[in-house]
Amino acid sequence: MKVRNSLRSAKARDKNCRVVRRHGRVYVINKKNPRMKARQG
């Protein structure tokens, strides 16, 4: 999982990427390609 300042580029990497909030943190997850994960902050 990458830790990034901004998730805009992480979200744009694949059309299946979704932005979700869990426990006050913002994540990008991808069910089709689980390698495309990122966390903000």
Swiss-Prot record:
Gene Ontology annotations of biological process type: translation
Claim: Ribosomal protein is one of the keywords in the record: yes
One Gene Ontology MF term: structural constituent of ribosome
Listed SUPFAM superfamilies: Ribosomal protein L36
Keyword field contains Lipoprotein: no
Keywords from the named record: Ribonucleoprotein, Ribosomal protein
Gene Ontology cellular-component annotations: ribonucleoprotein complex; ribosome
Similarity section: Belongs to the bacterial ribosomal protein bL36 family.
NCBIfam families hit by this protein: PRK00831.1, rpmJ_bact
HAMAP family: Ribosomal_bL36
Record's protein name: Large ribosomal subunit protein bL36
